[in-house]
From Swiss-Prot:
This is CinA-like protein. Transmembrane segments: none annotated. Belongs to the CinA family. It comes from Prochlorococcus marinus (strain MIT 9312). HAMAP family: CinA_B (MF_00226_B). It comes from the Bacteria.
Length: 424
């Protein structure tokens, strides 16, 4: 888009979206396509199946944007109101495209619905000068229409497979020719572990005000990401903008950064162990196998991961990991002493180079003043029987799966840092 353009908006239509009955994957996918085209995508809106509300939103968008892309509401039922609402927004009538009705009848000629598809005729009505977007996968066409100068609407059905096909076969070329310039967006994402989003943001306040490239932090559970995005004519030009910022961030945060883009913490750990030709095993209690699952979700994990013993009960800690009843009684299952013994013993039993043991109270019950919900002990046993013990107390307001997930993250990141220190 040219520098004086007002941008693109996405309008998702459907009460099921507002109620959370379905996830709006269409808006995400369209956003990605717009980014690849270098278009200025400023806003997304969602509205239910109410004609007056749809009209109000469309009229507002027409005053501030150049291009509106809608999904949903093109079907044959009474609550499919998109085309009608668009026409009313600009006080125009709808006219039947008779050839579309012929095409629909042809599509359904061998269908069991052929005697009951008269309601589909509704899908053949459009503003007089609208360009039709053919729907090869369904019966609801879309349209390209410029109701007022400088404002264009593209409509798509809500079915993702239909929308994507229509986009790729018809809409993409139109958007490229009319709205896209030679610029595209290119991004590089740095991934952090062991540091919070607010701490990261405080340290890079100056970078957050950059215009090109832009720097944006966002967080997942146990992980912070910094996305550096440049608008440029080529990947080389974009990298020239992105790389100086990336190097500054790497210098600032050093070991907190575990990877980029599609890297994952388990994947990075597996690669490092494979380079060292070393193996790992786990002894899990409070995570119940989640630590093992995180590793085995990565292709190639069998190179380094030998197996795991999940000892949820004290009896199994005793019988499978040789943790004495005396030690369990004296210190409790959730303790540094027991966790350290779990790591040492599973490493010896399964004959690995490294072992991680974890025991904790994931809640919501089971905590006390001395050992609250959220308390987790982690022990890492390495070559030469070197032991690293870690104690974490996660916020007790977190739910069970959050505490388990954060615990797994600490396990993986702690071993990553140990291996990193051994490089130096």
């Amino acid at each position: 888009m040219t520098s004086n353009s007002k941008g693109v908006e996405i309008l998702s239509i459907g009460t099921e979206l507002l109620l959370g009955n379905i996830v709006n994957t269409n808006a995400k996918w369209i956003s990605e396509q717009l980014s690849q085209l270098g278009l200025n995508h400023f806003r997304q809106s969602t509205v239910g199946d109410n004609c007056d509300r749809i009209i109000k939103v469309i009229q507002e968008i027409s005053q501030r944007s150049n291009l509106l892309i809608t999904t949903g509401g093109l079907g044959p039922t009474p609550d499919d109101l998109t085309t009608e609402a668009i026409a009313k927004s600009f006080n125009v009538s709808l006219f039947e495209k008779e050839y579309l009705w012929d095409e629909i009848k042809q599509k359904l000629s061998n269908s069991k619905l052929q005697d009951n598809y008269s309601s589909l005729r509704k899908q053949c009505f459009f503003p007089k000068n609208a360009q039709i977007i053919n729907n090869p996968r369904g019966t609801a066409p879309g349209m390209i229409w410029e109701p007022i100068k400088g404002f264009t609407i593209l409509t798509f059905p809500g079915v993702p497979s239909e929308m994507k096909t229509m986009w790729e076969e018809t809409a993409l070329d139109f958007i490229k020719n009319k709205f896209s310039d030679s610029y595209s967006f290119f991004s590089n994402t740095l991934k952090f572990s062991g540091i919070g989003e607010s701490t990261v943001a405080e340290k890079i306040n100056d970078l957050l005000n950059l215009k090109n490239p832009t720097v944006a932090p966002y967080a997942n559970l146990g992980e912070v990401k910094l996305r550096i995005t440049a608008r440029a004519k080529s990947e080389v030009e974009a990298n020239n903008l992105i790389n100086p910022v990336k190097e500054k961030l790497k210098k600032e945060f050093s070991n907190f950064i575990f990877g980029e883009n599609h890297d994952t913490l388990p994947g990075v750990l597996i690669k490092e162990l494979a380079k060292r030709n070393e193996t790992i095993v786990f002894a899990e209690s409070c995570t119940g196998g989640l630590l093992s699952s995180s590793i085995t979700s990565i292709s190639g994990s069998s190179q380094v991961f030998l197996g795991s013993i999940v000892t949820y009960s004290n009896d199994l800690k005793n019988s499978l990991l040789n943790i004495s009843e005396e030690k369990l009684k004296k210190y409790g299952a959730v303790s540094e002493k027991v966790c350290q013994a779990m790591a040492t013993n599973v490493k010896e039993k399964l004959e690995a180079d490294w072992a991680i043991a974890i025991s904790g109270i994931a809640g919501p019950n089971g905590g006390c003043k001395e050992k609250p919900v959220g308390l987790v002990h982690i022990s890492i046993s390495g070559p030469n029987n070197h032991i690293t013990n870690i104690k974490k107390t996660f916020n007790s307001t977190r739910n069970r799966i959050e505490i388990q997930t954060l615990s797994v993250n600490v396990c993986l990141n702690s071993l990553r840092l140990i291996l990193l220190s051994k490089r130096k």
